[in-house]
């Protein structure tokens, strides 16, 4: 039975949902006379996935027919699923029809490997040439570079797309060889390096010739799957740091592994996606990019995984409590960034405002400081800090306060997730009341963490 355009869109939009490496454009190219659409820095809007969610882009695959057999991928060769393939003109016309109806502002185009990487890339290039040339589409385009694509085709792709991305997928060569034998480390990092070098050359050329063609002006990104292989959070974070430094990536995305098929090399089908771990990786990634942290400060070989109860910044502050409290009216900018509850914007506001007058809690609150966390790590005008003491006991108390502020302040009652007899039973066994409450609340936190 011949597939309709809607059949193809339904299949290929659904097949693209596991690819998370797309966000707002990050480019500021304005419309030119005679073109359709524009690309604004705040990002794209009004795109719809197959299940009706509103997202930034039309996110779709060119095809889900794949010659690779990657164990973690729903589109792998051995998986029995409905298959579909867009013709280049079909997808170009579909994109323009969606754009004219104001459904989308851009296109996120990826693909399974149809035949060979070069053949697949040539089909993707055909779509982009139609959009940029025949239809004069000036909107945002994010294209996925297929691992193993020739440098010549990758170069052409970069001049037509606003952003390129090559997915690392798995954080070690060993896991890549085990789960994706058709891919190799070289086939992933070679195009990543080419994109970085070509992008730098393009930016340099633009300083000499203002109308020079732009190569991937919004940069490049990548994606890693979390939980499909045994690597630690420290290993993943070190790889992330290396890619930011070496290839100048704009973003690294993390995707909690969702079991899609029975495979002895992978977690069981009833395994829940490690969403809390994914969340912690994004928080640590933020520290690398905006807070001047290094991976070795956040985690190390002795503590290779994230604390499930505290975010990475709070965990670092508790472990280095000897550096606190800091005086917000005197501390260097770099130290302000390391205070829980103070972000880059509020740190800059503090830096500017304290030149005029000494700052107190009221001023800090107006500047966006989250005092619920910051109060344990700062002193300021009229406030000597809410410090729970030094040593192991002090760190334990502040940890519990950061998990649940009511535990430390005692200002109000926190309703328990469990029945009161649970506390009474522990007290009856000789456990001190404060310890009984702590044990029950720890059980509650663990239960919530597992649910995540």
Predicted features along the sequence, with ranges:
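Residue-level signature of tetratricopeptide-repeat
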Residues: 353-354
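Long C-terminal interaction/binding lobes of large macromolecular proteins
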Residues: 1, 214-216, 234-245, 275-277, ...
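Long, highly charged, low-complexity intrinsically disordered interaction regions
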Residues: 265-337, 373-422, 451
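A structural motif corresponding to the C-terminal lobe/cap of the Radical SAM core domain
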Residues: 177, 189-196, 227-235, 241, ...
